[in-house]
Design a protein with these regions (language model features):
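Acidic (Asp/Glu-rich) sequence patches and key acidic residues
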Residues: 1-106, 112
Length: 112
């Protein structure tokens, strides 16, 4: 992966400055083995909060945000209609999200 890291890679980095994509509902535990994460500076550099808040009005950069299947489809669509970099980042996450949605109806983004 180019934009996202798995939990082993995040742990090796020694940093917690990541937004974590976690399968299902957040249950008071971070950095799960099947999560993916994106470095906060990369998120900020590409203004990904703008993309997510366009679809998820209550997106919380510093808290937790649930993303439904319907919302994800809208995020994917908007990313394709907007910036090329958004499309690339979302396409990379989409592989993980599709696997998540086989088992769960939502995933949670755990912010800073």
């Amino acid at each position: 992966m180019i934009f996202f890291v798995n939990e082993d890679q995040r742990k090796t980095s020694g940093s917690t400055c990541y937004l974590e994509f976690q399968k299902g509902n957040y249950n008071d535990k971070c950095w799960l083995p099947d999560s993916i994460s994106i470095y906060c500076e990369l998120w900020d550099e590409h203004n990904l909060s703008d993309l997510f808040t366009h679809v998820v009005k209550d997106f919380d950069y510093f808290g937790t945000t649930k993303i439904s299947k319907k919302q994800w489809k809208e995020i994917v669509k908007l990313s394709k209609e907007s910036h090329q970099i958004w499309q690339e980042i979302i396409a990379e996450a989409d592989l993980w999200v599709k696997e998540c949605f086989k088992e769960y109806d939502i995933f949670t983004i755990i912010g800073m």
